[in-house]
């Protein structure tokens, strides 16, 4: 396996080291290439992502990302627009995958959380995030700013198909989320895609939520969900809410996936670089380790993916609220997957 590693900034460096420790405990064929991308490089020479970086990254089977950014020194949005979004668009990461599971030992803010285990499939290359907009008469009383949500049949069809496939492999229930009563053009395209592709998956139950209703249900009845599919913006909102109801983002992994496998997909913990605790050895590496499990599953190694997920589940279940040490968690999980 040829793996590109972008450990990034802050605690990204620490949690990525533990994720690699666990990966190498289950696989002895991992060849890693480290990339200096993130706040440190930007502050050093002003670079975010060069064409040479991109071409080199494309030569790998997958990308493991730690965390990017330092809000103390890098202006907001610089690395998102200059590094993360270009990676997703230029590597055609059409599917942003976010499993959301309430692990034993994790504390949900919900009073009666019940069993929470669902996946959000977020469209990753279109919608309001594709940069189709502009400003006229900036700085005047007549200023006009626009952002255009771009939705294509090609883009929507492939993410909807991916979501149906995942639902078929899970509990056979798909919920699509939009705002069709107001966003009639984009919503209509999404609805036609759902209806068309749904005919190929007659065993999958389909329902629909407006985005505002989905935020309510995710807080009041999250166990109703199995697979959620939605657009880029709504998915961005829902996945953060999903992280909150499952006890925070310490156990939240994600994948930015090219479903065609023509480009390397990228896997990362949801959390940020947390510079306030960087270097203290107290960051929870479980989200980064679960990102490795997502990566292995994407690459067809289901057995080792399940092995890692079980080890993380056991790790979470065994916690008693005491402070954790980053390397100790990595050591325990690495030992567990080798047992």
Curated annotation (Swiss-Prot):
Q: Per its UniProt record, what PANTHER family does this chain match?
A: D-MALATE DEHYDROGENASE [DECARBOXYLATING]
Q: What SUPFAM superfamilies does this protein's entry cite?
A: Isocitrate/Isopropylmalate dehydrogenase-like
What are the recorded Gene Ontology BP terms? L-leucine biosynthetic process
Subunit annotation: Homodimer.
Tell me which HAMAP family the record gives: LeuB_type2 (MF_01035)
Chief location of this protein within or outside the cell: cytoplasm
SMART domains to which the protein is assigned, alphabetical:
Iso_dh
Q: What name does this protein carry?
A: 3-isopropylmalate dehydrogenase
UniProt KW Amino-acid biosynthesis keyword:
yes
Q: Does the keyword Cytoplasm apply?
A: yes
A GO CC term assigned to this protein in UniProt: cytoplasm
Q: Which cofactor does it need?
A: Mg(2+); Mn(2+)
InterPro entries assigned to the protein according to its UniProt record, in alphabetical order:
ICDH/IPMDH, IsoCit/isopropylmalate_DH_CS, IsoPropMal-DH-like_dom, LeuB_actb
Annotated GO MF terms: 3-isopropylmalate dehydrogenase activity; magnesium ion binding; NAD binding
- Biological source species: Corynebacterium urealyticum (strain ATCC 43042 / DSM 7109)
């Amino acid at each position: 396996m040829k793996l590109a590693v972008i450990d990034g900034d802050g605690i990204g460096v620490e949690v990525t080291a533990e994720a690699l420790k666990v990966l190498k405990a289950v696989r002895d064929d991992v060849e890693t290439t480290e990339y200096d991308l993130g706040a440190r490089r930007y502050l050093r020479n002003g670079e975010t992502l060069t064409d040479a970086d991109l071409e080199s990254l494309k030569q790998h089977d997958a990308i493991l990302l730690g965390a990017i950014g330092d809000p103390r020194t890098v202006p907001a949005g610089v690395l998102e627009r200059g590094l993360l979004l270009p990676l997703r668009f230029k590597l055609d990461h059409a599917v942003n995958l976010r499993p959301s599971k309430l692990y034993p030992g994790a504390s949900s803010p919900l009073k009666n959380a019940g069993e929470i285990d669902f996946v959000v499939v977020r469209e990753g290359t279109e919608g309001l995030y594709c940069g189709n907009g502009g400003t006229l008469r900036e700085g005047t009383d007549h200023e006009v700013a626009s952002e255009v949500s771009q939705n294509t049949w090609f883009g929507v069809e492939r993410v909807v198909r991916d979501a149906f496939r995942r639902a078929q492999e899970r509990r056979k229930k798909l919920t699509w989320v939009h705002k069709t009563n107001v966003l009639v053009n984009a919503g209509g395209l999404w609805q036609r895609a759902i209806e068309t592709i749904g005919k190929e998956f007659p065993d999958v139950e389909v329902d629909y939520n407006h985005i505002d209703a989905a935020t309510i249900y995710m807080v009041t009845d999250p166990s109703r969900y199995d697979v959620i599919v939605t657009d880029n913006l709504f998915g961005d909102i829902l996945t953060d809410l999903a992280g909150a109801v499952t006890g925070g983002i310490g156990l939240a992994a994600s994948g930015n996936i090219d479903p065609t496998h023509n480009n390397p997909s990228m896997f990362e913990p949801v959390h940020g670089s947390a510079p306030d605790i960087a270097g203290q050895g107290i960051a929870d590496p479980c989200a980064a380790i679960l990102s490795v499990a997502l990566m292995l599953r994407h690459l067809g190694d289901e057995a080792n993916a399940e092995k890692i997920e079980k080890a993380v589940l056991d790790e979470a279940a065994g916690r008693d609220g005491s402070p954790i040490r980053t390397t100790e968690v990595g050591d325990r999980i690495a030992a567990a997957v080798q047992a």
